[in-house]
Amino acid sequence: PSREELAVYIEEAAVSVTNNYEEAPAVLMVDDAVIGTLGNFSASIGKAKSKKTFNVSAIAASALSGRTVLRYRSMFPENKRKILYIDTEQGRHHCQQVLKRILRLAEMPDDKVPENLIMLSLRKFAPRVRLLIVEEAIGKTPDLGLVIIDGIRDFLYDINSSSESTEVISKFMQWTDDKQIHIH
């Protein structure tokens, strides 16, 4: 960036003691504990086959239905009800099974396309293309409030590359801040 651009960035990033800044709205809870706010991201971590996808399905079902699902509660504003669910590891058949599970948990019919849930299977794409697809989907989806990414490591060519990891996390921070969404 040029010096002029840096000056603009500094101005944009300045925090003043006299300004009023709104607290990020809580949108995801487990019981009464906040686990997600708009403008931020969270993660489910665990060993392979430790039911992370099932756990995330319950989060998606709660956000989709507005009800408590397996102790998860969600409170997305009216203009933030759209969910984008991205799976980087599984093919379309498996993703469809996850989609049906989410709909069952949300007590919604699994023979009708849900209005507020978009699922993408990105297994066949290269890591860089996956990231670009997600960026485009986030940018063009109106009323987006929640983005679930199952398989964040698949955005990286080298899981041990700190520069690649920093680049992906920086994108997440940019998207959550610019779009005021929650990424999980």
Regions found by a protein language model. Give the residues of each.
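Conserved structured core elements
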Residues: 54, 163-166
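C-terminal regions of RecA-like/P-loop NTPase motor modules
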Residues: 1-3, 140-141
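Structural recognition of the conserved hydrophobic beta-strand(s) that form the central parallel beta-sheet
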Residues: 44, 148-150, 180-184
